[in-house]
A protein has these predicted regions:
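ALDH superfamily catalytic-core signature
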Residues: 197-202, 228, 237-391, 412-414, ...
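HotDog/MaoC-like acyl-thioester-processing domains
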Residues: 530-540, 623-677
Length: 677
């Protein structure tokens, strides 16, 4: 008897006492593992996440959490062979497995990088600029993101047992939210194998990850307003979750990513001899056959000009006829099995419904020639290509979650846009065209109905990641039928798991709360130049108030001649006098910034290693000849790097003139040594 899959709950592995039900190898029908409906104490798991996992994560900064994800991905990479072998048993070929396993690990690496590069080494994220709420500047506001004291529950689909878990885990983890993972039963044995390697790594804070295998009945019953549920699956199950009392009235945040009727449009400019024609045909066949079409982003609707329908149909048939279907671990096989024979029956039913208004032009839903396996024992199915009758409704309503696509024709670009919208909301759409006007009309017309749109042509094809590939840095989700949710998107995905709050108060209070110097807060001007302080000595608010410098006409003339910037406002007195903004010769803005640097820089070698940029530079008041300027430089944000002997310091710079008017404001970015801790 095969082993019964275990759950990981409250810090230990839970083994069901019953034999459970068999999970079949998609290729052979043999039992891979068994799954029980009897799981651990769900309420206890939720409480453990809140009281153990959450506090442990929130003790860490964003950078520390991100570094854990990086090390975790490196650890998992060492077990790829183990995961690949199990993935093949789900029906996934090597190409399919790369999308799931390698794609999952790549998502961890990507979020780790984003977290370390775009978030502070802190526990609070500032959102947007400071809002001035009073004339005197004593009452201000700042939007911030903070970590929720809740739990992220993920309910995943069967098609991506690795990527589906990790793409939800990564942003939640960086946000400081512990996760409870509920994998789909059919492929849960692969998820269990990955989680076991994650737990044994010792990298994850206790309680930050738990795994619930089997029935998820009651999973939402103990959730509340600080908790988030991320669901991937069918629209019907999504509707059931939306109607749960804790979602309807209990404040539980639900993010739904549902399967959708994604389309790919062939532009009216494309002819059979164009590179875009081959790109289109190849893309459709790829999306039909990767994961045997069991992808929420697969192309279900092939929207082509009526004049090109025959050519596209013939080309698709030519490519599909070369696709070998069979055992996932056979190197000659292009398309593997569906996840189960039950799933194959579901696809066959959907194909039958589609055929009420569409002609079958390739494939046979009932039989297929199989390589390296038995067609009856495994869950194999032929790729199916249909061609819809004019005005057919079924292709826009019925989804066959398998290797099935339907050709739909259009006569005008406006009609193509309308057909795309009839899907009632999709995760992704694509357009293959080399006409910029067509691209503009189609993309702007279909964007409200899509979470992502790919425009493919000869220029980007070589480096394109393809129609069906969600990327960690781009949002994944879609309106309407696609669930109305949104995930991934780099730091956007992290913030989705946090709470945004507007904090009002005095500048000093906001500085104390956020750990970020706020305009109007106290400044500390001491005897030691801030550039002589390493990160262990430097404090938020440390300031240098510079000496003064007169900007002479000779300075302006020299800068113009030396740099070649001879714009008339700096060189032509008559023209400059006629300018309504200047009324005479003015100094270059970059001259003012350069002179300011000369006023605040401490030149000798010291803790400051480099200036690596300037942010938010604004020139506010023209500086005329003989103006007297000075600069105030204040340590605004200190971000130690966790894996380096230096960190980043952001300085608030304000250049003022003899009338104490601000002439320039900006942030100076420096790298500063940590020193001895």
């Amino acid at each position: 008897v095969s082993e019964v899959l275990e759950s990981y709950a409250q810090g230990s592995w839970f083994t069901p006492t019953d034999e459970g039900s068999p999970l079949a190898d998609a290729n052979t029908g043999e039992t891979v593992a068994r799954i029980s409906k009897n799981g651990p104490d769900v309420a206890g798991m939720v409480e453990y996440a809140r009281t153990v996992g959450g506090p442990a994560l929130r003790e860490l900064t964003f950078h520390q959490r991100a570094n854990i994800l990086k090390e975790l991905a490196k650890h998992l990479m060492g077990y790829k062979d183990e995961f690949y072998a199990l993935s093949h048993r789900t029906g996934a070929t090597a190409r399919d497995t790369m999308v799931d396993v390698d794609g999952g690990f790549g998502t961890l690496f990507s979020f780790s990088s984003k977290g370390r590069r775009e978030l502070p080494n802190a526990k609070v994220i500032l959102d947007g600029p400071l809002e001035q709420l009073s004339k005197g500047g004593t009452f201000v506001a700042q939007h911030v993101y903070t970590s929720r004291p809740g739990v992220a529950v993920q309910i995943n689909a069967f098609n991506f047992p690795v990527w589906g878990m990790l793409e939800k885990l990564a942003p939640a983890f960086i946000a400081g939210l512990p996760s409870i993972v509920k994998p789909a039963g059919q492929t849960s044995y692969l998820t269990v194998a990955v989680v076991k390697r994650m737990v044994e790594s010792g990298l994850l804070p206790e309680g930050s990850l738990q795994l619930l295998v089997g029935s998820h009945r009651g999973l939402l019953d103990d959730l509340g307003p600080q908790d988030i549920v991320g669901f991937t699956g069918s629209a019907s199950t999504g509707t059931i979750l939306r109607n749960h009392p804790n979602v309807v009235s209990g404040g539980v945040q639900l993010n739904v990513e549902a399967d959708s009727l994604n389309c790919s449009i062939l532009g009216p400019d494309v002819k059979p001899e164009d590179p875009e024609f081959d790109l289109y045909v190849k893309q459709v066949v790829t999306e039909m056959t990767v994961k045997a079409g069991q992808k929420c982003t697969a192309i279900r609707r092939v929207i082509v000009p009526t004049s090109m329908a025959e050519a596209v149909t013939e080309a698709l048939i030519g490519r599909l006829s070369k696709v070998k279907v069979g055992a996932a671990d056979n190197p000659d096989v292009r398309m593997g099995a569906l996840v189960s024979q039950d799933q194959r029956e579901e696809v066959r039913k959907a194909v039958k419904a589609l055929r009420t208004s569409s002609e079958l032009v390739f494939g046979d839903p009932e039989r297929v020639e199989v390589t390296g396996a038995d067609a009856e024992s495994g869950a194999f199915m032929s790729p199916i290509l249909l061609r819809a009758e004019p005005g057919a409704k079924e292709p826009h309503d019925v989804e066959a979650f398998g290797p099935v696509s339907t050709i739909i024709t259009y006569d005008t670009v406006g009609e193509a846009v309308e057909l795309a919208a009839r899907g009632q909301g999709s995760l992704v759409g694509s357009l293959v065209t080399n006409d910029e006007d067509v691209a503009r009309e189609v993309v702007l017309g279909t964007a409200p109905w899509h979470g992502r749109i790919l425009v493919l042509n000869r220029d980007d094809a070589k480096e394109s990641t393809g129609h069906g590939s969600p990327l960690p840095v781009l949002v994944h989700g879609g309106p309407g039928r696609a669930g109305g949710g949104e995930e991934l998107g780099g730091v956007r995905g992290v913030k989705h798991h946090m709470q945004r709050t507007a904090i009002q108060g005095s500048p000093d209070m906001l500085t104390a709360i956020t750990g970020h110097w706020t305009t109007g807060s106290r400044r500390a001007i001491g005897d030691v130049h801030p550039f002589r302080k390493d990160l262990t000595e430097l404090r938020i608010g440390d300031t240098i108030a510079s000496a003064e410098r007169t900007v002479t006409r000779a300075d302006i003339d020299h800068f113009a001649e030396f740099t070649g910037d001879t714009f008339y406002a700096h060189t032509d007195e008559e023209a400059a006098a006629a300018n309504p903004l200047f009324g005479g010769i003015v100094a270059h803005g970059y001259l003012v910034v350069s002179l300011a640097a000369g006023l605040f820089v401490d030149p000798a070698p010291g803790p400051v290693l480099a200036n690596f940029g300037v942010d938010h530079l604004r020139f506010l008041t023209p500086v005329k000849e003989d103006a007297v300027i000075k600069v105030t430089l204040t340590a605004k944000q200190i971000t130690p790097r966790t894996n380096a002997d230096y960190g980043e310091v952001r300085w608030d710079a304000v250049v003022t003139d003899q009338n104490d008017e601000a002439v320039a404001t900006y942030d100076v970015l420096t790298l500063v040594a940590k020193g001895d801790e």
